[in-house]
Amino acid sequence: MSSDIDELRREIDIVDVISEYLNLEKVGSNYRTNCPFHPDDTPSFYVSPSKQIFKCFGCGVGGDAIKFVSLYEDISYFEAALELAKRYGKKLDLEKISKDEKVYVALDRVCDFYRESLLKNREASEYVKSRGIDPKVARKFDLGYAPSSEALVKVLKENDLLEAYLETKNLLSPTKGVYRDLFLRRVVIPIKDPRGRVIGFGGRRIVEDKSPKYINSPDSRVFKKGENLFGLYEAKEYIKEEGFAILVEGYFDLLRLFSEGIRNVVAPLGTALTQNQANLLSKFTKKVYILYDGDDAGRKAMKSAIPLLLSAGVEVYPVYLPEGYDPDEFIKEFGKEELRRLINSSGELFETLIKTARENLEEKTREFRYYLGFISDGVRRFALASEFHTKYKVPMEILLMKIEKNSQEKEIKLSFKEKIFLKGLIELKPKIDLEVLNLSPELKELAVNALNGEEHLLPKEVLEYQVDNLEKLFNNILRDLQKSGKKRKKRGLKNVNT
């Protein structure tokens, strides 16, 4: 259901609104002028009538008509909405504005705060530069920096958005009345939904310490990590133009490729690809190239992603980087054109399997059958099997025989603690010895799969399970399993000695 603010946005024209403040020059289908929010000698402030947004390519600020008035008049977003409603004779009842709407406004304001802070912080700016991120790309993606919890809270209070922002769980509960920004002293990467609304953040530490290298916003009323893709909003037009998407592993892989002019790129949000993410991507393209790191972890992650994309009805093109290279390292050594050639020369999954099966027919046949089981289109499945049969004379009944695709098809009942344990193995990737833990044979088998990166062999309920404070819960459960494992070992020794 749309809110009063959604209706106001639809009923006012951004060109009319901004023209009341600035002299706009028509350029093609858009308008431009000097940016009022930073010293701007050459026009870098653009207004799009078709998208009803403004964007400055100098300082990075952007948004809708209401946000422009909010920034220009130095008033809150909601005060600006009331001002525009009054100016254009529209009714607006702030009491009826949904809680979600207020959360989106809060996230957008925090995004602005982070972006402005990056420009003022030399260390953070140098870090972004050191990663090979073009300044224009940094502005396009609204990269930022979290300098101070106190400064963030001050901005939120000034805009009457603190209560709304607390819904995101990005502010840690106050100690002695003081809130702590979850992303404090990190480079911040805004995560947007396909409509361009900021829904969460990723954070990358810029100093070497014991904290996690990357952190993400917790799941909240507007953000579900397993249901969104980083870069989709920025890349969707390029995906449409190119006819395919490139799936990479992480934030900076994507930003690096974007900086090199390869823009039809998306990434999961710091974790393995989920079925929901694959389904979302399939709405924008039916052809995906997987460009993961050229190491064991990257190969395993690719193997886990392929079935999810196939299940979503997508044609998959695995791209194999040389051993030990990630996309950034490959570009540095061989250049972006060589990467383009590698991508363009990568074959479709089944086409490649059929072409290379003779090298190891037994293994390739099983791999072919395994992936074939994820194709829901019966006609395509039969056609692929027929092609394999014609070339290698493997009986059709064997090729089409349903094989156990993964543990998602098994009836496995897992307790809350078992789900948390497996989820922790996937997300946190701890170095632990399973032999010292008190695990059932079934749970141990699943744990081995999780540690080996064989996530496609894990139950769907584990992969899609969402929980706050995962690390804390996992560590508590791990301690319990270690304690019970020691007790079991002692009992075993006692029985041997008696």
From Swiss-Prot:
Binding site for Mg(2+) 2: 293, 295
Catalytic activity: ssDNA + n NTP = ssDNA/pppN(pN)n-1 hybrid + (n-1) diphosphate
Single Gene Ontology BP annotation: DNA replication, synthesis of primer
A molecular-function term among this protein's GO annotations: DNA binding
Every Toprim domain range: 243-324
Cofactor: how and how many bound: Binds 1 zinc ion per monomer. Binds two Mg(2+) per subunit.
Enzyme class of the recorded protein, top EC level: transferase
Calcium in keyword set: no
Matches recorded under CDD domains: TOPRIM_DnaG_primases
Job of this protein: RNA polymerase that catalyzes the synthesis of short RNA molecules used as primers for DNA polymerase during DNA replication.
Family assignment from sequence similarity: Belongs to the DnaG primase family.
Comment on protein domains: Contains an N-terminal zinc-binding domain, a central core domain that contains the primase activity, and a C-terminal DnaB-binding domain.
NCBIfam families for the chain: dnaG (TIGR01391)
Protein name: DNA primase
Lineage: Bacteria, Pseudomonadati, Aquificota, Aquificia, Aquificales
Gene: dnaG
